[in-house]
């Protein structure tokens, strides 16, 4: 129907140009008018809350998991869509057994490595699958130091990286499922779990201590600069950076075509549940369809649009080639061209991704990120950090 118009609220502002071009193409192809606005200044949650208050609500909203949970009563049930069976349900946002959020992209985190730099400095072939334990990692770090790379590691000081990404792996890697993570934090809350006695905590923190020791910003770790870290790994001044595939945005402008990069799981001594074989990640943005302010024709047009993204060549091209995203759907065989995305795509295809634990309080990464910053800066002991984390959860 030529009169149908759908609106989309994009909350990944780095993709706004691609979205606008897509909207134009889509209208030419289908006759459906698509208008894309972008969140500026506000968090996605703040922006969409204001829009629901004013009644100016987009047909499709791109949100984080907590936004979809908050808007559950207005979100269309997508469980019966054709794409649900090929990654939609597995990676989508499911609330009370109903699929409410379409998984827009897969992101995962681990140790980013510069394979080319490692091989040049050590004179040996680098195979990340052979670096499994903390001791394996120490051995390669020492080789790099001996070869002249004085500080082979970068650690971000940002609270989201420390509290939102490194610490949450302790939850996610209890057994690789969101349920296992939930049981673990419930155990901290009721006092039945003590971090100091937990193998995964000790294992990941032993590796963290090692990364701290070889950190290029060791002398002043809380003054580390994210962009400097990105440049250092890209140009081969360092070998390893704890981060995720989103970092390609900062790395790409400095990358040389003949340099090989990838992401590997965090090496650690506790290999239970294949923790050293898996990246932690999952969908990081979801598309939901509003049923309160958008009429049935708009809702159907929005469903058609999501179907087109998954099954139409132009839709697939938008996700993978234009936006450089790792798709959640197994029918899409386009290969992501950026090397970090390619790593994550391979782990996804091999089903070696541990679920992101999303059921975290809104202040988790800020509050516990600040405690992790103290530990990174040697301003507290591991026991004091354990006590801070336990007391945070017991207050929830």
Per-segment meaning from a language model:
Residues 5, 29-39, 56, 122-129, ...:
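A local structural motif
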Residues 38-47, 132-136, 220-234:
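Short helix-initiation/N-cap motifs at beta->coil->alpha
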Residues 100-104, 136-190:
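Extracytoplasmic/periplasmic solute-binding protein
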Residues 142, 182-222:
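Glycine-centered hinge/linker elements that transmit conformational signals in sensory
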Residues 148, 313-314, 326-335, 342-396:
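Conserved C-terminal helix/tail region of periplasmic/extracytoplasmic solute-binding proteins
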Residues 63-119, 138-140, 262-264:
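Hinge/lid segment of periplasmic solute-binding proteins
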Residues 28-29, 33, 119, 254-321:
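Extracytoplasmic/periplasmic substrate-recognition and gating elements
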